[in-house]
Structures are given as C-alpha cells and as structure tokens.
Amino acid sequence: MLTKKTDPMIVSMGPHHPSMHGVLRLVVSLDGENVIDCDPVLGYLHRGMEKIAENRSIVQYLPYVTRWDYLATMFTEAITVNAPEKLANIQVPKRASYIRVIMLELSRIASHLLWLGPFMADIGAQTPFFYIFREREMVYDLFESATGMRMMHNYFRIGGVAVDLPYGWLDKCLDFCDYFLPKIAEYENLITNNPIFRKRVEGIGIISREDAINWGLSGAMLRGSGVQWDLRKVDHYECYDELDWSIQWQSDGDCLARYLVRMGEMRESIKIIQQALKAIPGGPYENLEARRLNEGPKSEWNDFEYQFISKKSSPTFKLPKNEHYVRVEAPKGELGIYLIGDDTVFPWRCKIRPPGFVNLQILPQLVKGMKLADIMTILGSIDIIMGEVDR
C-alpha cells in the first residue's frame, strides 16, 4: 500500500481565540492531529510599562502597575512599593503589614478562582465557571468596601496602605473564610475525580524537576514538579513568618499536579487570612501616620499641607542612588522588580520580571508531540495573563 507523505499544516491560533487568555497567538505546525511545532507570537498588548516608570514618581506610577496582571492587582502594587521601601530602608508599621498580607491572600484566592473557571471551560466543563464567579464576587465585595475599587485597587503606599480597614470589615472577612472553605471541598468533589477531567489532565504537559529549575519556572509550575520553593518562606517578607502555614507541592509535574497545587494554595490562603485577622495589631496603618502620632499635636505632620494635600512626603519621595531586586510570590509565580535609583523622584531603571512571561517560554517544548486539543489544557495550566507577559 502506497503512503503519501503530506506537508505539515500551519494553523494560527489566536490572537482572538476564546481559549487564549488574552491576545496571544500560537503558530502551530500540525501533522494530522499531532503537534510538530509551536511558535508563540507575543507583543500584542505591549504598552511600554518599563519606560513609563522612568518618567513617573512611584506614587504616580502606582495606578499603572495594576494593569500588568489585572486579576491579581494587589501583588503588582505590593512589589512596586516594596522596591523603594527596601531601597530607602523605610519601615512598615505592623498593622500595615498584616493588612497587606490579608489583601494579598484574598487577591491570590480571586486569581486562582479565575484561573480555575476558564481552565475547566477550556477542557469542556462549563459548570464550575459559574460557581467560581459566585465566590469571586464576594472577594471583590471585600476589596470594594476596603479600597473603594473592585479591581485596580491603588491601595498600597510607600510605608503602608492608603486607608485603614473600615469598621466591621474584619468580621465580614472572617465570615467569608468560614463560607469559602467548604466551597473548596465542593469544587474538589465536583472536579478532581471526574473521569473525563482526569483523562484530559493526567500525564499531559509533564515538566521534570530539572526542567522546571533550568527554565526558571516559578509558582505552581515549579511546585507542581516537586520543588518546594515559595518566596513567602524563602524571602520572609511582610509578616508571613509569624503565621502557621505550609508550602503546597506535588511531584508529578503534569497539568493535574498544577491544578492540585493551586487548589491547596486556596486552602492555605484561607488559613493565613484567618490567623492574620485574629492577630492583627492596632496602631498606625502607614509610616507617615506613625511619625505624626509619635511627635504629638505640635508635629509638622499635623500641618494643613501634610494632612490634606495628599500626605506631602510621598510625591516628593527621592529614590537613593542605589539598586535593588525585590520579589513576591504572586499567584502565577515570582513577580520581581529590579529598581535603580538616581537620587531623583524618578527611577533610573525599573525592570519588571513577570512570572507569566518566563513560564510561557516552556510551552513549545510541552506541546510538541501532543494532540492539538491538549494545547489548551497545557496553556491553561500555565496560567498566563497577557498584560504582564507583554507589559
């Protein structure tokens, strides 16, 4: 029987494909249903965020940073204020640190929920998509009552947070934690042992421990491959050391392992929030406020311009002639900023290290030899947001 060798078919997936999680284009070479090669095309959402940073003071730049990973905006704000804090050695009051941790973990839950829904929809399960939006709305309600915004919160400031938590907010947050824990169990009962789900994710997109380290992966991509690496434990930032929680990890390295890591992380986040809510101390919520309270009623911080004109010290805050790399454990991995100060209010250089951009590099290697339908499963398990990939 004669067999005719056919040329590979080139298919362009995206940039407006419903499963692309933003404007990503994949140029895929196919032999029948099998993927021979995959070439990601980036840059559709490039806005020059690093260059904008060089022409703005840190406080002016804060509203921009929430547009990188617009589903976990607290983390982009945290890293933007942490960098100048470390650079100029600014102390953050204890209360502010606890408020930050609560906000960061709520943001992590919201991000993981909005990963889970579309990931399941990509695989073909529509129902969880509606479940996760129900719980995510509650997180956004908490954000709205504390910061005034549901997304793009603009809440973090150099030396603390913009405003203190409103009256009754801590109780509302505790109620949410009590409500949400059983919901995670409900998701797991619904999804984890579903035979169709298992067939779509088990043994798909396997990353070995060595590959995960060599490619510089971070977050669930790294911990799903058996590496117990979480920057909250490694870098000891904010007040995570004072709370009792454990790193979530799996050793299989496939899409199922990454799913299990993120489900476990939501549980740990609730645990962290509950402890922080119970242990949160009193006192000032921001560094300038702390100085004002320390110096009493005759302090210059009590003057009209410091009280009412946007807390004057922030807009004219000069970055020392120094350089520093600061990172946080964002929901998608290691989010870092390399900041170089030049003794002016503007940074001389602000290099962003987004987790999505680095994690996406391994995609062509993972999809080679797989079926076309597996591309969506693998891409979904990486969890990218094009806002931070393209910046």
Swiss-Prot record:
Q: Reply yes or no: does the keyword Transport apply.
A: yes
Q: What's a Gene Ontology MF term here?
A: quinone binding
Q: What class of enzyme is it?
A: translocase
Q: Where are the coiled-coil regions?
A: none
Which keywords appear in this protein's UniProt record, sorted alphabetically? Chloroplast, Membrane, NAD, NADP, Plastid, Plastoquinone, Quinone, Thylakoid, Translocase, Transport
- InterPro entries in alphabetical order: NADH_Q_OxRdtase_suD, NADH_UbQ_OxRdtase_49kDa_CS, NDH1_su_D/H, NiFe-Hase_large
* Keyword hit for Isomerase: no
The record gives the membrane topology as:
Peripheral membrane protein
| Reaction(s) the record says it catalyses | a plastoquinone + NADH + (n+1) H(+)(in) = a plastoquinol + NAD(+) + n H(+)(out); a plastoquinone + NADPH + (n+1) H(+)(in) = a plastoquinol + NADP(+) + n H(+)(out)
Function, please?
Answer: NDH shuttles electrons from NAD(P)H:plastoquinone, via FMN and iron-sulfur (Fe-S) centers, to quinones in the photosynthetic chain and possibly in a chloroplast respiratory chain. The immediate electron acceptor for the enzyme in this species is believed to be plastoquinone. Couples the redox reaction to proton translocation, and thus conserves the redox energy in a proton gradient.
What family is this?
A: Belongs to the complex I 49 kDa subunit family.
Subunit record text: NDH is composed of at least 16 different subunits, 5 of which are encoded in the nucleus.
What is the protein's given name? NAD(P)H-quinone oxidoreductase subunit H, chloroplastic
**What is the originating organism of this protein?**
Chaetosphaeridium globosum
